[in-house]
Each structure stands twice: as structure tokens, then as C-alpha cells.
């Protein structure tokens, strides 16, 4: 059975944000059973964990001797067993992969710039000066994303794929603000994707682990 590493507990602002949610969601979409290896704070810095994940992050996926880190790689691995995530059609499959990579490379770095300021440095003078520029940059990317989405329900048209899964989790990083949801098209897109039963099961599973540890 697949095992996913996750934190046993994180502060409330980070709950529903930790990257193991991406792996859990993908597994739920694929209908694959899994179990979690819950880490206490500090476990991620231990030598045995760093041997598997050099950056000390979650999640790690383990299955039959295979160890994978990085949520993008993990979602693609799971997607190999799910036509929902990675369609059989070669073109659609490539586009799903394209959007997954776009979420991680073209959107997430700009989203994280704002999130780090808001969640960790909001009262610092340098952050107050830096935030308007960071918001401007992310809004440019979000505007381009919204334009590409257009009136389609999902990034590649009528079907949800791994690209939508990854993009949604990236956009949710800014759920504490209206930077994303001020765009009605993107707000509706997030609502549509998070209404999926697989997302709800994944989210509830992550939050359930945190509640058990509280």
C-alpha cells in the first residue's frame, strides 16, 4: 500500500495548506488506498528522514521500495493509474502535465511571495513596502491564468485533470486574502474544483489528523 508522509500537527493558519493534501487528493481521485506516516515537528530534520527527502519537507510517497518526494512528481506518479488525472489521449495527457508544471513554476512562486509576507512578516516595515509589488506581480500571473481559463470549467476544457488539482492547491495558498478570489472567474474555478468529493475526502483526512493530535 502507498504510504504518504505528513505532519501530525501544524498551526491553524497552515491547516489545509500542507502539501500532502495534493498527494491525498490525487489518491482519492485515483481511488487508491493509502496510509499516512505522521511526523512530529522536528522529525523532518532527522537523518533518516533527510536521507529520503533532502529538504526535510512533506510529502514523501513510499510504495514497494520506491521513494518519491516533491508533490508534482508524486501527483504525476499517481496519475499514471488514473485517467481522471492523466487522460489516455496523448494530447490531453501532455496538456494536463503542462498545467501541473505551470501551476508549480509560473504561479506558485508569485503566490508564495505574497503568502510569506502576509503570514510571517506582515508587521515588518520591509514587508509593508514589498507587499504592493508582490501583489502586482501575482495579479499579472493570475490575470493571464483567468484569461486562459475563460469560460471553460477546467483548464483543458470540460474535464478535470492533474493540472487542475495542482493549480487549485496553489491558488488556495492565498485563501487568507482576496488576491485570488477578487477575480470572479478564478473564485468560481476554485469553488468548482474543491466541490469534488475526492477533494473533500482528502481535506477532511488531513484536518482529521490534525484534530487527533490536538
Put a short name on every predicted segment.
Residues 6, 166-169, 204:
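Short beta-strand segments
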Residues 103-195:
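GST-like fold's C-terminal all-alpha helical module
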Residues 40, 162, 206-207:
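Short, solvent-exposed turn/loop segments enriched in Gly/Ser/Thr/Pro and often Arg
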Residues 1-129:
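GST-like domain detector, emphasizing the conserved glutathione-binding G-site
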Residues 36, 87, 158, 183, ...:
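A generic structural-conservation signal
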Residues 185-214:
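Long hydrophobic alpha-helical segments typical of transmembrane helices together
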Amino acid at each position: 500500500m502507498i504510504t504518504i508522509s505528513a505532519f501530525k500537527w501544524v498551526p491553524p493558519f497552515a491547516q489545509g495548506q500542507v502539501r500532502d493534501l495534493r498527494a491525498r487528493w490525487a489518491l482519492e481521485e485515483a481511488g487508491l488506498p493509502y496510509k499516512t506516516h505522521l511526523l512530529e515537528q522536528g522529525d523532518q530534520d532527522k537523518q533518516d528522514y533527510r536521507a529520503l527527502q533532502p529538504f526535510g519537507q512533506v510529502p514523501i510517497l513510499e510504495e514497494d521500495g520506491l521513494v518519491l518526494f516533491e508533490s508534482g512528481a508524486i501527483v504525476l506518479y499517481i496519475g499514471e493509474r488514473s485517467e481522471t488525472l492523466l487522460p489516455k489521449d496523448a494530447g490531453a495527457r501532455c496538456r494536463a502535465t503542462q498545467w501541473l508544471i505551470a501551476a508549480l513554476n509560473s504561479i506558485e512562486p508569485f503566490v508564495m511571495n505574497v503568502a510569506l509576507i502576509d503570514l510571517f512578516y506582515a508587521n515588518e516595515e520591509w514587508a509593508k513596502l514589498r507587499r504592493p509589488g508582490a501583489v502586482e506581480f501575482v495579479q499579472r500571473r493570475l490575470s493571464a491564468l483567468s484569461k486562459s481559463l475563460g469560460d471553460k470549467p477546467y483548464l483543458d476544457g470540460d474535464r478535470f485533470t492533474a493540472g487542475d488539482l495542482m493549480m487549485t492547491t496553489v491558488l488556495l495558498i492565498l485563501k487568507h486574502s482576496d488576491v485570488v478570489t477578487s477575480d470572479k472567474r478564478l473564485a468560481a474555478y476554485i469553488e468548482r474544483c474543491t466541490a469534488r468529493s475526492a477533494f473533500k475526502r482528502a481535506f477532511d483526512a488531513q484536518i482529521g489528523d490534525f484534530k487527533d493530535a490536538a
